[in-house]
Amino acid sequence: MFSNKPVIGVVFGGKSSEHEVSIKSAKTIYNALSHLSNKERYVARPVYIDKYGYWHDYIFSESILYDKKDHLIFEDRRVNLTNLSNMEDIDVWFPCLHGPNGEDGVIQGLFKSTGKPFVGSGVLGSALGMDKIAMKSVFKSYNLPQVPYVSLNKADIQNNLYMKSIYEQINKIINYPCFIKPANLGSSVGITKAYSKEEFITGIEFAAKYDERIIVEKSIEGRELECGVLGKSIMKSSVVGEVKFQTDWYTYESKYNANLSSTIIPADLNIEISNKIQKLAIEACKAINAYGLARVDFFYQESTQQIYINEVNTLPGFTKTSMYPTLWEASGLKLEKLVASLIEIAKE
């Protein structure tokens, strides 16, 4: 042990296409752990996973956070993964990973095997939260409101008879425009919006480059709202925020470019709708067994006052433009206290 204070292993990077976002999130968390009261309570240790899946020591990992990697020899800083489960200096793992191998239950299973607590959902909640098809199936079983959708596998694209049935379902229950998404990616990676059958086919082929499983959703003309959830045995929800963007839809570029999107926190909603969204956010998390932290995304049609759950993100971002920490700050919980709360929840 480095001291009597709990050592927090901040894990980031990874093989996912959201690698760079993960680094930004980790820097926010690491800085929050090194700030004022948290510095007196915890010892923060960064653990970087490179794009090839290699784990690296604390010195090299910290250099990645502060962009000093050119001064170090890359190969000499790798950590033997077989020894990772016996890293006695880590008391609590804090994953800042996004996408496959980070928030899909894979690394959660590894953490569980170490016998050390970790921030966020367990294997089941993470896996269900990552796979949009599995998540929506659970929502359906709990009668939670969501937009119409159909799903298919990459192998189905070459099956003309099967694709004919998909086209029929699109025309019958979804219509155009519609969204085509890889089932297991976040940050709008691999997503297209199709206005015709031709664009739909192109979108399917594009999504198939990222995932074997593909989901097609009805496009809803409405407001995009988000709500944070915090807790395990007792869950609470944040104020509701709204995302506005200059692009046709909430693309990867608009998510991480402050000039292309903006947020309104709290969202301009009547109290009844706001309360309903906060309640649904917790219900959605409980349905898929997500806990610790989560951001739940919604669509809201003002004309019908209909609320649709879009998805649960079990490891939301902590970048400068990320909604989750901003929602909680607007709810009276500043970043440093939020991070400390997440660690204490992990130890429950």
From Swiss-Prot:
Ranges where the ATP-grasp domain occurs: 136-344
GO molecular function terms attached to this record: ATP binding; D-alanine-D-alanine ligase activity; metal ion binding
Keyword set, alphabetical order: ATP-binding, Cell shape, Cell wall biogenesis/degradation, Cytoplasm, Ligase, Magnesium, Manganese, Metal-binding, Nucleotide-binding, Peptidoglycan synthesis
GO biological process: cell wall organization; peptidoglycan biosynthetic process; regulation of cell shape
Domain of life, per lineage: Bacteria
Cofactor(s) for this UniProt protein: Mg(2+); Mn(2+)
Major localization class: cytoplasm
Pathway terms, separated by semicolons: Cell wall biogenesis; peptidoglycan biosynthesis
Binding, Mg(2+) 2: E311, N313
Cofactor comment text: Binds 2 magnesium or manganese ions per subunit.
GO CC list: cytosol
Binding site for ATP: 171-226
Protein EC: 6.3.2.4
Catalytic activity as recorded in UniProt: 2 D-alanine + ATP = D-alanyl-D-alanine + ADP + phosphate + H(+)
InterPro entries linked to this entry: ATP-grasp, ATP_grasp_subdomain_1, D-Ala_lig_Van_CS, D_ala_D_ala, Dala_Dala_lig_C, Dala_Dala_lig_N, PreATP-grasp_dom_sf
Binding site for Mg(2+) 1: D297, E311
NCBIfam families noted in UniProt: D_ala_D_alaTIGR (TIGR01205), PRK01966.1-4 (NF002528)
Family affiliation: Belongs to the D-alanine--D-alanine ligase family.
UniProt function note: Cell wall formation.
Name the UniProt record assigns to this protein: D-alanine--D-alanine ligase
Source organism per UniProt: Prochlorococcus marinus (strain NATL1A)
Gene (UniProt): ddl
